[in-house]
């Protein structure tokens, strides 16, 4: 078991500990449960799926990286597939607060990066801020998405974001988590550039058209890709670097172990992630960063 989970795990009921331990003890446990895992744990612990999501919140919050606020937020995204995806807030020292990943963004993008096609509920240990409500409003399932908070009845996202502004107001019909391939290409690709290109091609960037992807390679040899997730309100958009760092953190790898990165984006796009990605990666100790432009 990753050390970050130990304290929260000890607080769980014995029946839930027994059901979860074989899963969470796996060296490759990456902060998600498959639908089969969820069903097995629910049966063994006598919890339904929603109750299990609440019970898992302390484990999700244990994944938080909050060096500025010291405020740990956890979230569980329940996929239409039945899978559970952990999420936690991530803060980055020495760069703007705007680079923060909120727990709901973390859980939603975690599901997206694992190719989940929709969400039925997001369970979180604190009320979602307006930024997160707007971020989730980009989802195909936004109208029916349930938000579940401790001590409150479940309510739809529209309850927490009435009279919302979203993709429909900008005549956008391709939404976050839709299956998409932009079909862009690169010349002279190596294996890492190919992964970053694939991420760019699956980006959600209907407003700027500035598709972008990134791949991070760690000292252990693992790779993590990130896609750009744009938002109708612009500011809640999630850059590809954060999407990749989120996956890396949830997998339990130290962010300081990134040794190489590849950024792929459009040349002369109205939005570029190159400069801020360089700055943030340098703060994490990685200065070996490649920049590739998509063939137009």
From Swiss-Prot:
Alphabetized InterPro entries for the sequence: APOBEC/CMP_deaminase_Zn-bd, CMP_dCMP_dom, Cyd/dCyd_deaminase_Zn-bd, Cyt/Deoxycyt_deaminase, Cyt_deam_dimer, Cytidine_deaminase-like, Cytidine_deaminase_bacteria
One GO term (biological process): cytidine deamination
Active site, per annotation: 104 (proton donor)
GO MF: cytidine deaminase activity; identical protein binding; zinc ion binding
Reaction(s) this enzyme catalyzes, per UniProt: cytidine + H2O + H(+) = uridine + NH4(+); 2'-deoxycytidine + H2O + H(+) = 2'-deoxyuridine + NH4(+)
EC number: 3.5.4.5
HAMAP family hit by this protein: Cyt_deam (MF_01558)
Free-text function comment from the UniProt entry: This enzyme scavenges exogenous and endogenous cytidine and 2'-deoxycytidine for UMP synthesis.
Annotated family: Belongs to the cytidine and deoxycytidylate deaminase family.
Protein name: Cytidine deaminase
Record gene name: cdd
